[in-house]
Amino acid sequence: MAATTSPMASQLKSGFTTKALVVPKGISGPALRGFPSPRRHTSFTVRAIKTEKPTYQVIQPLNGDPFIGGLETPVTSSPLIAWYLSNLPAYRTAVNPLLRGVEVGLAHGFLLVGPFVKAGPLRNTEYAGAAGSLAAAGLVVILSMCLTMYGIASFKEGEPSIAPALTLTGRKKQPDQLQSADGWAKFTGGFFFGGVSGVTWACFLMYVLDLPYYFK
């Protein structure tokens, strides 16, 4: 078996080695030749450049903790907004909480009379003024009760103010007395007195003095 197959294998081997490779031809007949590639293959190595100065992260989380949320925005941190908020009665820490409550109550009571008079259920009757004034006074009473409940739930009697005693620059300041049980009680009492006074003053201007207002 081996003697008979060896001549065939040798003939096949010699045929493959001696036979010339067929060169492909184009459509017109001549052999195709390879064109030189217009691209130039270059190789380079990318290496990181070591800077002389150490880099640092420009935007960092609050206090270095990424899990702490910050509510500071360009609007809330602008000097104009800070000036406006610092002049509101609730944020004037140098003013007594009682006087702050009176000022806030006067504004609320005075402004609540008009909507109740013109949009109340008795707006088309002759009792619109009296009903609207009483409704505004009732809302002031309800708001005063809500402020009282908030003070009882948030502050403990006899404990000092929970407001911070340091500014952002580290300067010591007097804690806001409004953030205490006694200060909040004064604020609530002032709000009730100011609110009722504001309602009374608005009713007096519209219906007692009988001034030529746009609506009554």
Curated annotation (Swiss-Prot):
Q: Which residues lie on this side of the membrane: Lumenal?
A: 156-188
Name the InterPro entries for this protein.
PSI_PsaL, PSI_PsaL_sf, PSI_suXI
Give the Stromal compartment stretches of this protein: 48-134, 210-216
Record's protein name: Photosystem I reaction center subunit XI, chloroplastic
The text of the family note is: Belongs to the PsaL family.
Detail the disulphide connectivity of this chain as listed in its UniProt entry.
none
Q: Which domain of life is it from?
A: Eukaryota
Source organism of the structure: Spinacia oleracea
What does the UniProt entry say about where the protein is found? Plastid, Chloroplast thylakoid membrane
- Note the Gene3D superfamilies from the entry: Photosystem I PsaL, reaction centre subunit XI (1.20.1240.10)
GO biological process terms held by the UniProt record: photosynthesis
- Membrane-crossing ranges are 135-155, 189-209
| Post-translational modification, as annotated | The N-terminus is blocked.
Annotated membrane topology is: Multi-pass membrane protein
**Gene designation per UniProt:** PSAL
What are the GO cellular component annotations? chloroplast thylakoid membrane; photosystem I reaction center
Q: Which Pfam families match?
A: PsaL
- What keywords appear on the UniProt entry? Chloroplast, Membrane, Photosynthesis, Photosystem I, Plastid, Thylakoid, Transit peptide, Transmembrane, Transmembrane helix
Where does the transit peptide start and end? 1-47
